[in-house]
């Protein structure tokens, strides 16, 4: 019974189950499964049948765990051949002892260790790669989140700025301050003498130019206020009893061309319209707005009241200072002037608000004093 054999370049014959090792005239067979050395092919065949249950080409799977070097076998054979040649020269055939090679598992253990180390390195490399990918993904998410927050903050700041601008524009457009810049004016000597005699404050009025004497006023009078909104108010005053001279004087005052032009940001308020319309009511002896001592009247219950004697106003005040503030409505006087832009105001609070908005001045309200002449 034969075996399929392949002769290699290094004088080794390999089969599927064993290795044929040649040395001179002798050879031996090494079992690949258990590394046992056998002398003949019959012994090898019987060995693989009995020990490894090999039946007609069906064998168990095995792995080669060791390698044999032919140089060691040849060195051992050469040593034994030299020894026998020095003996009897008549001997033609010499039996060469078999080189006994015992398989050790060191080579297989080293291979297994190297494979384990290689697998561990691969696993570690894969873990590091996964960690790097996770870190990059987390960084990308953080960057996207920061960009979203920055965008939201920018939108909020822009909306707040737009709201502030709208609010400031609304406030500036809804202001009801009336600015008048009259020239330097003085009161007539008669009014100054009367004010000095009554120890009252002299308020300078707008310059009243010489008025032409109009014809007698009709029953229905029309008063036109020269304002920025060009509002014309008509009224029907009651029958006026008095001399023609007084009526003509009042009409001249109303229609005189020397009145200063009012610059208003909005239409005239109800109080201003009432003040303009009241100029054709029953006349008084004087157009001066100086509060006099004779305007105080005692009521039935003994309380003292100060009554506004400007034409037909007749409003009552408990304190004289309140009445003086009220008379400013009739006189159109502006005692509080802005030292930066020459704007004038009736009340100090309006001047304070103007200085805060227009000139960004704060904390100097105590320095605002009415202008005295």
Swiss-Prot record:
Domain of life: Eukaryota
A biological process term (GO) from this entry: regulation of transcription by RNA polymerase II
Keyword entries, A-Z: DNA-binding, Metal-binding, Nucleus, Repeat, Transcription, Transcription regulation, Zinc, Zinc-finger
Major location (coarse): nucleus
Zinc finger (C2H2-type): 29-52, 306-330, 336-359
GO molecular function, one term: DNA-binding transcription activator activity, RNA polymerase II-specific
UniProt feature, compositional bias: Basic and acidic residues: 110-119
Ranges annotated as biased composition (Low complexity): 121-140
Subcellular localization(s) per the UniProt record: Nucleus
Start and end residues of each stretch annotated as Disordered: 110-144
GO cellular component, one term: nucleus
PANTHER family the record matches: PR_SET DOMAIN 13, ZINC FINGER PROTEIN
General function of this protein: May be a transcription factor for genes having (A+T) stretches in their promoter and/or enhancer regions. Binds to AT rich DNA.
Protein name: AT-rich binding protein
Taxonomic lineage: Eukaryota, Metazoa, Ecdysozoa, Arthropoda, Hexapoda
Gene designation: ATbp
């Amino acid at each position: 019974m034969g075996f399929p054999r392949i002769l290699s370049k290094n004088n080794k014959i390999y089969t599927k189950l064993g290795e044929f090792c040649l040395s001179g005239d002798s050879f031996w067979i090494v079992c690949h499964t258990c590394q046992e050395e056998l002398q003949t092919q019959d012994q090898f065949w019987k060995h693989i049948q009995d020990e490894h249950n090999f039946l007609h080409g069906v064998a168990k799977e095995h792995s080669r765990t060791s390698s044999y070097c032919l140089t060691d076998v040849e060195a051992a054979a050469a040593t034994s051949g030299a020894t026998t040649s020095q003996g009897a020269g008549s001997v033609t055939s010499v039996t060469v002892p078999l080189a006994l090679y015992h398989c050790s598992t060191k080579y297989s253990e080293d291979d297994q260790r190297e494979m384990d180390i290689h697998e561990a390195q691969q696993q570690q490399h894969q873990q590091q790669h996964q960690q790097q990918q996770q870190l990059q993904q987390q960084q990308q998410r953080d960057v996207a989140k920061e960009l979203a927050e920055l965008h939201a903050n920018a939108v909020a700041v822009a909306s707040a700025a737009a709201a502030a601008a709208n609010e400031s524009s609304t406030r500036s457009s809804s202001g009801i301050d009336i600015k008048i810049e009259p020239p330097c004016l003085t009161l007539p000597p008669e009014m100054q003498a009367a004010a000095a005699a009554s120890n009252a404050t002299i308020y300078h009025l707008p310059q009243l130019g010489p008025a032409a004497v109009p014809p007698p006023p009709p029953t229905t009078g029309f008063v036109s206020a020269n304002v920025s909104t060009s509002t014309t108010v008509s009224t029907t005053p009651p029958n006026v009893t008095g001399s023609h001279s007084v009526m003509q004087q009042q009409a001249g005052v109303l229609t005189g061309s020397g009145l200063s032009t009012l610059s208003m940001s909005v239409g005239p308020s109800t109080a201003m319209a009432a003040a303009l319309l009241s100029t054709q009511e029953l006349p008084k002896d004087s157009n001066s707005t100086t509060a006099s001592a004779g305007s105080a009247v005692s009521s039935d219950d003994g309380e003292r009241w100060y009554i506004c004697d400007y034409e037909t106003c007749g409003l009552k005040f408990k304190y004289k200072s309140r009445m003086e503030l009220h008379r400013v409505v009739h006189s159109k006087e502006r005692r509080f002037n802005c030292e930066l832009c020459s704007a004038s105001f009736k009340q100090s609070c309006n001047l304070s608000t103007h200085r805060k908005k227009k000139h960004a001045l704060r904390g100097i309200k105590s320095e605002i004093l009415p202008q005295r002449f």
